[in-house]
Amino acid sequence: MMNASAMDRQAVYEDYERTRRTFHQLLDSASTADLARPTRGTKWTNGQLLWHMLFGYIVVRALLVLVRVFGRLPRGVGKAFARLLNAGTVPFDWVNYAGPLGAVKVFGPRRMAVAFDRVLDSLQRRLAAESDADLARGMHYPVRWDPFFKDFMTLADIYRYPTQHFDFHHRQLTLDSDDGRGGKPEVS
C-alpha cells in the first residue's frame, strides 16, 4: 500500500484547476465545426471526446464508493470482483464508446462546462475531508478497462486518475489543427 501521508493534496488540487482552465478554454474557443471535427486516434468527434474527458471525472465519484466498500472487504473479494469486471470488458467498451455519442446531444458546451465545475468542486471537497487512512485504503481494478487502472489502486490513486485520463485524451483533440487530421500549425 502507498504511504497516504506522501500524497500531495495541493498538487492534486492544482492539477484539477489546470484541467478546469484547459477544459473551459477548449470549450470557449471551439466553434460548432471544431466540435464536429474527428479526433486523433479515436472514433469520436472533438465534442464527444470532451464529454468523455468530463466523464472521467464524473466516474471517479462511483469509484470512490467502490473503494470504500471493497477496501474494507478481504482482498480476495476485490480480486474476484475485478476479474468479473474484466470479463465484462466488451460490453463496457461498447457503453464507454456509445455514451459520448448521445451525451453531446444533451450536454452542449455550456452544460459540459457547468458539469465540469460541479464535479471538480465536489472532488476537491471530498479530498479535503479524506483522512490519511482513507487515502491508503484500496482495491483491485479491472486493468482491461482503462490503461491507467492498475491491479491495485488506493483512494489517493483514484483522486489522481481523472487528470491522467484527461491529459491523455487532451492530446487526441484536433481543436488546434488547421486540417482536422491532427497536424498542428507551425509556430515561428
Indicate residue ranges for each PLM-predicted region.
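Charge-dense, helix-prone N-terminal extensions
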Residues: 1-2, 125, 129
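Hydrophobic alpha-helical core bundles mediating ligand binding, dimerization, or RNAP-core interactions
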Residues: 16, 20-23, 116, 120-123, ...
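Extreme N-terminal tail/first-helix region
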Residues: 1-17
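Short, Lys/Arg-rich amphipathic segments at extreme N-termini
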Residues: 13, 19-35, 170
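Short, contiguous alpha-helical
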Residues: 36-90, 121, 129, 133-188
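A short, structured beta-strand-centered segment in the mid-to-C-terminal lobe
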Residues: 15, 104-116
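Acidic/His metal-coordination segments adjacent to aromatic residues that form catalytic metal sites
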Residues: 98-108, 147-156
